[in-house]
Amino acid sequence: MTNLRAGLWLVAMLVSAVLSASAAPPEEKVWSASYPLAPGGEVSVTNVQGSIVVEGWERAEVEVTAVQVLAAGTTEAAIGVERSPERVAVRTLYPAENQEPVEVNYFVRVPRQARLEGLLTVNGDIHIRAVEGAVTASTLNGDIEQEGAAASVQARALNGNIRLALRALPSRSDELNLETINGNIELLLPSRADADLEMKTVAGRISSRLLVSVSETPGDTALRSRLGRGGATVRLRTVRGDISVDPNQDVF
């Protein structure tokens, strides 16, 4: 009987130790660096597991902060940087292909006029604020959101929503292309916008407070419309999701 109790006590202690280890919070490791960037320079971030947040500021430099979330079974990644006076390119470098990728979340500050020519992640959201240069952003599983856009935007998602709030419309020669497969698209325009809209959804609705005639019934719907005198081409496409085009209440 004594041996049985001792055995049960040992098993209980082992189970408790395993549960404690599995419940241990993941470790966070922070890396940060700054690089000068010429006016109108280019910034790119390539990631796999984790989000990308970019914010514009008044300094002529790029500040990159990477936060790695080291959970059980993951190995620390390296942060690769290629830089020149006109370009800063950041990439997550994993030690081995057969290991589970560690989560790396990027927080990046860039000059307001910088061009974001390649914000890429596989599993994670992309958020952009107060950047007035051209933007190209792509994620497979995550949302894309930009506040204060004023130039060409190319945003693509597979499973995720896209939200774009424009401070000003780009020039007539520029384009806005927002595309997702499984997700909604929300576009907020200045109230006196001049643009040419092309919208299409296969299983969803198109709604707008800027257009006179819109589709209120779900289904395979395509709509073209000109706002004001026309201008930059705006293409909004989703397969399974709704599209909305409304005034940006923060811009008059």
Question: Whereabouts are the PLM-identified features?
Answer:
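Intrinsically disordered, low-complexity terminal regions
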Residues: 1-252
